[in-house]
């Protein structure tokens, strides 16, 4: 039995979720709602500057894409309430436009007949925020309809924080995400409500805000108010880095910290968190499927309890892999996902 999925919005994350979902024999991507022609969408799926050429045949049909012989319906509506989710018996909509992250707006998909909505961003008044590997056990299929997959940075930060807190206890901390530029910035200097993001993204290191530390309290509520942070947008197109400094409740060594991450990577956080002691750089983590990869060579301890940890993440592919994991997690707990 496959879960029937529709993707609303086909930008960077929408397309990566599509690529990953098409590899999963438990998921049927029924439809894509996007504003561009079939020819344009087919081309953008087949050829990707960051993640390379798609290894499946993609053909533009009439109001559809044909991927390795499988038809995916193409729609073009700016109003979720007008989408034919009831007609196609859609179980889960992946909301990837960035425009419908508030619950009242995302509910348009439910009014149209979908059973659940997964937001590929932090939500507003969402029913629950889930970070796989951290709090997926909090999902309640009876109560939760609008589900946020949080942000790519929160997906990196939360597993790292959880390991440190469970192993050693966290008093407080500060994080910086050294983040690849995104579509929310300008290629050349142009107006933006954030005057730093108004500057050319390929030319400067750009300090700006991140909600990752604040959002952490949604998945690890006992740490509310204990972590804060900011972002540095840097001139690379993909792969980012969380730089976390925490004060722990117990004395540790760098070796003990790294061993804790190694254990988690092999057990409770297998597939979500990984560990590396190789001298790698950001491009080496392109298309890495993990939410966070600990850079063991850079772990530092000062005065026994102040710890610095670096964690790499592919902010596009790694995050999209967690969206697909969340689809499977939600579908497995729904009473009657559609039979295919």
Swiss-Prot record:
It catalyses: D-glyceraldehyde 3-phosphate + phosphate + NADP(+) = (2R)-3-phospho-glyceroyl phosphate + NADPH + H(+); D-glyceraldehyde 3-phosphate + phosphate + NAD(+) = (2R)-3-phospho-glyceroyl phosphate + NADH + H(+). Its EC number is 1.2.1.59. It comes from the Bacteria. In response to oxidative stress, the active site Cys likely reacts with bacillithiol (BSH) to form mixed disulfides to protect the Cys residue against overoxidation. S-bacillithiolation presumably leads to loss of catalytic activity. Debacillithiolation by monothiol bacilliredoxin BrxC restores the activity. The active site is at residue 152. D-glyceraldehyde 3-phosphate binds at residues 151-153, 182, 197, 210-211, 233. The record marks 179 as: Activates thiol group during catalysis. GO terms for molecular function: glyceraldehyde-3-phosphate dehydrogenase (NAD+) (phosphorylating) activity; glyceraldehyde-3-phosphate dehydrogenase (NADP+) (phosphorylating) activity; glyceraldehyde-3-phosphate dehydrogenase [NAD(P)+] (phosphorylating) activity; NAD binding; NADP binding. Keywords: Cytoplasm, Gluconeogenesis, NAD, NADP, Nucleotide-binding, Oxidoreductase. GO terms for cellular component: cytoplasm. SMART domains: Gp_dh_N. Involved in the gluconeogenesis. Catalyzes the oxidative phosphorylation of glyceraldehyde 3-phosphate (G3P) to 1,3-bisphosphoglycerate (BPG) using the cofactor NADP. The first reaction step involves the formation of a hemiacetal intermediate between G3P and a cysteine residue, and this hemiacetal intermediate is then oxidized to a thioester, with concomitant reduction of NADP to NADPH. The reduced NADPH is then exchanged with the second NADP, and the thioester is attacked by a nucleophilic inorganic phosphate to produce BPG. This is Glyceraldehyde-3-phosphate dehydrogenase 2. The lineage of its organism: Bacteria, Bacillati, Bacillota, Bacilli, Bacillales.
